[in-house]
C-alpha cells in the first residue's frame, strides 16, 4: 500500500485520491476521487483531469454538482455529513468538516471529510476543519489532520485532537504551500503523545 501527499491536502492512497491539487505528472489511474469541498485548492478540475479515467467514481458534496457534471460523464455520488456508503473495496463514512467562529468553511455549507475502510485499515481525511465536537469520537488507524491554521485548526489544536483520537499513525496536512510552515510541522510533532507514529509526507 502506497500513501503519499502530492501537495497541501492532495492525498493519494494507492489509486484512491483526495482533493487532487498541483499534480505534476498525469497518472490517469484513479479508481475513486474524493472531494471535500469546492474551494479551488481542493476541487481543481485541471488536476482531476490528470488522474481521472472513464471508470473513475467521484464522491463530492452537493454544491460540486454543477461544475462536475458540466465537465465529466463519470458516475458521481453526492454526499453530506454523516452519510455512509459502500463502494467496491471500501466502506465510506462521511464526516462533518467546518470552522468554528470563522467564515471560510461554514457548517451550513455541508462540506465534508471522509473516513474510509480500505485494505483492512481505516483512514480519516478531515478536510478543512477546526477541532469540532463531532470528531472527538472518531476512531481510525491513519489520521490526516490539517495543521496550517487560518483556514483550519492550527498545529496546537491539531495535536490536541490527534491525542484525543489516538490513531496508530498521524499525517499532518494543509501546510507548506498556501498557508502553514515547517515550523507548524515541528510544533505539531513536539505535542504528539508517545504511542502515536508520525508520518511526514510533505
Task: Outline where the language-model segments fall.
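Binuclear metal-ion centers of metallo-dependent hydrolases, dominated by the metallo-beta-lactamase
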Residues: 1-4, 72-85, 136, 159, ...
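Active-site regions of enzymes building and remodeling cell-envelope glycoconjugates
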Residues: 29-37, 71-81, 89-92, 141, ...
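Portal/gating segments that form or line small-molecule/metal binding sites
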Residues: 48-66, 71-100, 112, 186
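Metallo-beta-lactamase
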Residues: 115-168, 172-181
